[in-house]
Design a protein with these regions (language model features):
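Gly/Ala-rich phosphate-binding loop of Rossmann-like dinucleotide-binding domains
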Residues: 19, 23, 183, 187-188
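Flexible, glycine-rich terminal cap/loop adjacent to redox cofactors
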Residues: 7-14, 18-35, 40, 47, ...
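N-terminal Rossmann-fold NAD(P) dinucleotide-binding loop
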Residues: 15, 179-180
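Core beta-strand elements of the Rossmann-like FAD/NAD(P) dinucleotide-binding domain
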Residues: 2-4, 124-132, 249-258, 295
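Glycine-rich flavin
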Residues: 2-3, 20-27, 32-166, 194, ...
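Beta1/beta-strand and adjacent pyrophosphate-binding region of the FAD-binding site
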Residues: 1-12, 166-173
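FAD-site-proximal beta/loop scaffold in flavoenzymes
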Residues: 150-167, 253-327
Length: 448
């Protein structure tokens, strides 16, 4: 039996980043992974999707070249080459992770993990015991429990990332982050895209004003989006798939060559034997406290598996919090201030409270908004669609930032830093920004 200071189950961002930090702090770590290191994000999520987003953005640029004085632009999308580049990007980054965890303080075990007792885990035919255990097993794509969900051509996001040709017609069930990103990508690649969303608006957890504007923008790009659409079944229809749904009391149907199920994710807890060791969990994930500790002492859960926030960077920082708790280290992490991004065209970036959040919590607030059409850099880029909205308390303290437009995912980080520090609108107004830059949009909103 191997004895170590810390066992980490899962080598995604929440697992391998925590393992590296623990090793740097002098702990011995057993890191267990049943698949490829890097987790969903690197192998079948954030990274491969962003590689495709880059190609889609280039296609969009070529299509608009004449507006910039570049005429007679002809190009052909070589989809196999696009996918090969995607695989190369993933491999490069995965090789980097493999190199990082080749650390004398980290013992990598490849195999399915299961608890023997609270502090003993078995994997790859070997038992490991430790003082503390961190579960970082991530999540898997959910499927609607409807007839036809197992038909050929009904895909998860992982499966869609491995297709060998662009579908002529693509139906996406779910208008969350995953659904809208794939809608943008495959629309740019030439697919006829229809998105069906059960809620009243796309991106249900984002600022509702922003979500509406994004939906309208995607519609102008040829993406058909139906909200308040309850998908009932999927059936074979000729060479395609008929997706039946109900919208406002009317039965409707859309035919597609491929159907993407983008209806959320579920925590990977099935094979761990959690019930046997008394860890409390539900379909939403493993229950944890503010230090990411479960109800069983010395057993922690970070990332998607606890269901708090299914984002790679949230997993990383939850891992830091868990390790700090294990080692008795005080930290100043603000795990309530987690930015999020949607890599559509245009992008979305957000952090903190929305207007709806403030109303629900009874918080008096002020909303300030500046538009990219008045930003010099955005006009030069020809990307003027969108705005930055700041949410502030009546005392000026910054509570939220919501950006829809070029490079929104990057721009929101400034507001994230300010909110984390507890800074105010006045503090933001006093920060000098370079001109002309997109970042001026954030300060412009502060002055509105």
């Amino acid at each position: 039996m191997l004895t170590t200071d810390l066992i980490i189950i899962g080598a995604g961002p929440g697992g391998y980043e925590t393992a590296l930090l623990a090793a740097r702090r002098g702990l011995s770590v057993a890191l267990i992974e049943r698949g490829e290191v890097g987790g969903t994000c690197l192998n079948e999520g954030c990274i491969p999707t962003k590689a495709l987003c880059r190609t889609a953005a280039m296609v969009s640029d070529f299509a608009e070249a004449e507006a910039f004085g570049i005429k007679d632009v002809a190009f052909t999308l070589d989809f196999p080459a696009v996918m090969e580049r995607k695989r190369a990007v993933v491999k490069q980054l995965r090789d980097g992770v493999e190199s990082l965890i080749s650390n004398p303080n980290i013992h990598l075990l490849r195999g399915e993990a299961r608890f023997v007792d609270a502090l003993t885990v078995e994997a790859a035919g070997e038992r490991v015991t430790a003082k503390d255990v961190i579960i970082a097993t991530g999540s898997s794509s959910a499927m609607l429990p409807i007839d036809g969900n197992t038909l050929e051509g009904v895909l998860t996001s992982r499966e869609l990332l491995d297709i060998d040709s662009v579908p002529q017609r693509l139906c996406i069930v779910g208008a969350g982050v995953i659904g809208l990103e794939f809608a943008s990508v495959f629309s740019a690649f030439g697919s006829e895209v229809t998105v069906l969303e059960y809620a009243k608006e796309v991106l249900p957890h984002f600022d509702s004003d922003l979500a509406k504007r994004l939906r309208q923008s995607l519609g102008k790009r040829g993406i058909k989006i139906e909200t308040q659409a309850a998908v009932k079944s999927i059936a074979k229809e000729g060479d395609g798939l008929a997706v039946a749904y109900e919208r406002k009391g009317k039965e409707q149907s859309v035919t597609a060559d491929k159907v993407l199920m983008a209806v959320g994710r579920r925590a990977n807890v099935g094979t761990l034997n959690l019930a046997d060791i008394g860890v409390e969990f539900s379909p939403r994930g493993i229950a944890v406290d503010g230090n990411m500790q479960t109800n069983v002492p010395h057993v922690y859960a970070v990332g998607d598996v606890n269901g708090l926030m299914m984002l790679a960077h949230a997993a990383t920082f939850q891992g830091i919090r868990a390790l700090d708790a294990i080692m008795g280290v005080d930290d100043n992490l603000r795990l309530d201030v987690i930015p999020a991004a949607v890599f559509t065209m245009p992008e979305v970036g957000m952090v903190g409270l929305t207007e709806d959040d403030c109303k629900a919590q009874g918080i008096e607030y002020v909303a300030k908004k500046a538009f990219f059409r008045a930003n010099g850099k955005a006009v030069c880029l020809g990307e003027t669609d969108g705005y930055c909205k700041l949410i502030a308390a009546v005392d000026g303290r910054l509570l939220g930032c919501h950006i829809y437009g070029p490079h929104a995912a990057d721009l929101v980080q400034e507001a994230c830093a300010l909110i984390t520090r507890g800074d105010s609108i006045a503090d933001l107004q006093g920060i000098v920004h370079s001109h002309p830059t997109l970042s001026e949009i954030v300060q412009s909103a502060a002055h509105c």
